[in-house]
Design a protein with these regions (language model features):
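Thr-biased low-complexity repeat/linker tracts and other Thr-enriched repetitive architectures
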Residues: 76-86, 125-133, 149-153, 200-204, ...
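Acidic, Ser/Thr/Gly/Pro-rich low-complexity segments and short DxT(G/T)-type signature motifs
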Residues: 18, 25-51
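An edge-strand/N-cap motif at the start of beta-rich repeat modules
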Residues: 49-80, 85-88, 106, 415-416, ...
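Short glycine/serine- and acidic-residue-enriched loop/turn motifs that recur at repeat junctions
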Residues: 55-75, 107-125, 156-174, 208-228, ...
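Extracellular beta-sheet repeat scaffolds used for adhesion and glycan interaction
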Residues: 1-13, 235-237
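Acidic glycine-/aspartate-rich tracts in secreted/extracellular proteins
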Residues: 15-16, 28-32, 37, 60-63, ...
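Conserved core positions of repeat-based scaffolds
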Residues: 57, 94-97, 106, 143-146, ...
Length: 432
């Protein structure tokens, strides 16, 4: 509930159906005026209003991942057919997206069975995944982890590191349920070999590769190189929701409900944000979670060897590897130097501005929206990732044309292998 001047607004905690009638009620005494007098409990009837949402895509398209029914590359946005899209998650050259009717659609590279359609076939336009009870899908390298509305966990596609969580390395091209638990509420699949997930009780679970201690189990000596079933990390206050979990092939990060941010794994380029970094010869590792300073962290998304995160005050921060300018600091280093290891930043550095809203990342590219509906991008741009109609890398934010881009973290939901995403392409939502 939000109160502003003489207006009171209520925000649903879950999506509203466009076909249902809802009744809103509150008991007597719950709401009072400034004199302390209670308003009489009452009820209101309303129908949710669903606006049209369009998907726009650009970048690499070798597997049809832009949904254009072709394999042509685009360095400026092109629309994917349809106006009832709700949100999107990307993987390595493929995508899954939800529509308003809760159907899920796939397009792009179907290698390793990534489509979940019982085939290793690529699709250059959206095709439907069976079922309407999916609530969360997150993607990594040619594979997916998903949660249904009943709290069950599912997986399919690439599984060489045990990322299904079913205690096997078998790869399947259609969804398989992982265990019998019905309390999963968020899942984050990243890189080629790791998954993190939370349950409704606030616990955090991880599985997959453990080579760099990125599972946070206080094991970094290689004794156990991978876990193919979920293992719990200490604590019961881990946050869930869009962009609360992050990571890449060698490190992980997560936000707690108190706004603190924690990281673990490899720290070669300062990606753990602890104001210390290793060198090529002696990389520093932390095999259990360590806190990054601050208590107002809101969302986080990882690039290849670094992180991008927002705070509750609308500021945007970046740290780690900066070879392509992905930290937004107006500097980059295409060649290493002895005194400046790819211009890495081992502690959070602020990107100018205080109205940043949602974030998404690829391997070395960053996208972000502001509260005014503008959309910005920077970093790697070889395949037109920045949608600025050229392929020059940018080390500070550049605006993508338009002011009607959807704000809120669900707009650029996950760019996995990044966040909602792939390494070389982007899908974004407009509201019409």
């Amino acid at each position: 509930v939000t109160i502003s001047d003489n207006s009171l607004s209520m925000t649903p905690t879950s999506d509203l159906s466009e076909t249902k009638i809802y009744h809103l009620s509150y008991p007597s005494g719950v709401i009072t005026n400034m004199a302390g007098e209670s308003y009489v409990g009452t009820a209101y009837t309303f129908k949710s209003i669903v606006v049209n949402r369009e998907f726009w895509a650009w970048g690499k398209n070798n597997k049809g991942q832009l949904g254009q029914n072709n394999t042509t590359y685009y360095s400026s946005p092109v629309q994917i057919p349809g106006t009832t899209w709700k949100n999107v998650s990307f993987g390595t050259n493929f995508n899954f997206a939800f529509k308003n009717d809760n159907t899920v659609w796939f397009w792009g590279d179907g290698g390793y069975g990534a489509s979940g359609l019982n085939a290793e076939v690529s699709y250059s336009s959206p095709v439907q995944l069976p079922g309407t009870t999916w609530s969360r899908i997150d993607l990594g390298y040619h594979g997916a982890s998903a949660i249904k509305t009943d709290g069950t966990l599912w997986a399919w596609g690439y599984n060489a590191q045990g990322t299904y969580g079913d205690n096997s390395l078998t790869e399947l091209s259609s969804p398989i349920q992982i265990g019998s638990d019905t309390t999963w509420n968020d899942v984050n699949k990243y890189g080629t070999g790791n998954v993190s997930a939370t349950k409704t009780d606030g616990t955090l679970w991880m599985w997959g590769s453990n080579d760099e201690g990125m599972l946070g189990l206080n094991q970094s000596d290689g004794t156990v190189s991978k876990y193919s079933s979920p293992v719990q990390l200490p604590g019961t206050t881990w946050a869930s929701g869009n962009k609360k979990l992050a990571g890449w092939n060698s490190f992980s990060a997560a936000i707690k409900t108190d706004g603190t941010l924690w990281a673990w794994g490899r720290n070669r380029f300062g990606q753990l944000g602890l104001n210390q970094a290793g060198s090529p010869a002696t990389p520093v590792r932390y095999s259990s979670p360590v806190q990054i300073p601050g208590t107002t962290w809101k969302n986080i998304s990882s690039v290849q060897y670094g992180n991008i995160a927002t705070k509750t005050d609308g500021t945007l921060w970046a740290w780690g590897w900066n070879y392509w300018g992905q930290l937004g600091q107006n500097e980059h280093s295409y060649e290493p130097s002895p005194d400046n290891w790819f211009k890495s930043k081992s502690s959070p550095c602020q990107i100018p501005g205080t109205t940043w809203d949602a974030i998404a990342t690829g391997a070395n590219t960053v996208w972000a929206t502001k509260t005014d509906g503008t959309f910005w991008a920077w970093g790697y741009n070889t395949f037109g990732n920045l949608a600025n109609n050229n392929r020059a890398h940018m080390s500070s934010p550049v605006q993508i044309p338009g002011t009607d881009w959807i704000t809120g973290q669900s707009a650029i939901d996950r760019w996995k292998n990044g966040g909602s995403s792939s390494v070389y392409h982007t899908v974004m939502i407009k509201e019409t």
